[in-house]
Amino acid sequence: MKGLFFSLFTIRDLRGKFLFTLFILFIFRVGSYLPIPGIDPVALRSYFKSQSDFSITNYFDFFSGGAFSNFSIFMLSIGPYISASIIIQLLVYSFPSLKKMQEGEHGKKKIKKYTKYLTIVAAVAQGYATSLYAKSIPGALNIPFYRYIFIAILTVTTGTFILLWFGEQINQKGIGNGVSLIIFSGIVVRLQAALFNLFQSMRDPSQNINPVFVILVLSVFILVVMLIIYEYKAQRRIAIHYARANTKNTVSSYLPIKLNPSGVLPVIFASVLITLPLQILSGFAGVSVLSRQILSYLRPNGFYYTLLNVVLIIGFTYFYSKIQLSPKDISNNIRKNGGTIPGIKADEMEGYLDSIMNRTLFSGSIFLSIIAIIPFLVQNIFRFPYDVSRIMGSSSLLIMVGVALDTLIQIDAYLKTQGLSRRTSKQYAFLQKI
């Protein structure tokens, strides 16, 4: 890994991309501490200190990197955009006319435009809900509520689009996937606080945390990270033979089907899809008994929350993977290029690929589900602090590891395009061996 960091600072273009990415993420972190106009930060700090670790606000705060508890301009993060993307993709998958539209370049631009329109709707809805939540906090507002609600909705909606613009700038001028890195940075900043809370709890006799359990759980943490890396790279290879033109010889190739083709997207989608209704319900918790009951049932790291998270992760794993890898499209492309799968008839190819993908995705989704229940087990069996259990959970671990690997692979690809792959191949050999 020394060679990797050496390349980041010795290759001029790569150094520029790396520093630009850090600069954008730094601005995001600074913005996470800028409160919405009309909010009293002192009243907020006093209120959130009195909240339980299991409160819904701590859950929101975890994925926003502390922006939610500060009621900052970035308190919604990019959640509204991801929610809108999920809805649009479900519609595209359900309606053939939209699917056909997406195939053309003009149609893709229309779909992106619809996604941004829906992002505005989602941001306004979440902004309104968080405004109601702010009203329920004693002394939080230092301006009239009717003025605050307008300012808050406008501010957080603008903040979401600023973050989307940041993500696009990272995609164009930086390193890695911009949106994923923004989520990644929000989780990573909580890592230091989580470790500090763990050591503080170990020193507190009332917490009754056994140091042996700490070593055991941290060992499991390292093991899970290694398994996630393995799962990220694991793939099923299907042999394909292509006939050469004007000859009887064939060329052998293979079709790689990853254990989890959609990467961290199912985890991000599941987290956001849970967060959106909870955020809206939290705004009405002060006036609605039903909202309070639903929020108590879906308490973070509770049984029903964990169960819903597992179901959503499995569902999105299948849904998004089938969008990325359509057995029908793949089989048609193989036939058009004169390819065959040994032992499989041409008209049976689609069914064969579909069955292989279903079995592969089943294994991948079960793996993700097992990791999804880790926070529940760590919190309820070992009684670890909430932040620590969240860091060890599916959402945080998979996002951190997945985004880090994606960024490394993008750096490797960039170096290869610049003719520097021989100098740096040893740095990335570990990725190829996994």
Show where each model-derived region lies:
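N-terminal cationic and glycine-rich segments that engage phosphates or anionic surfaces
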Residues: 1-434
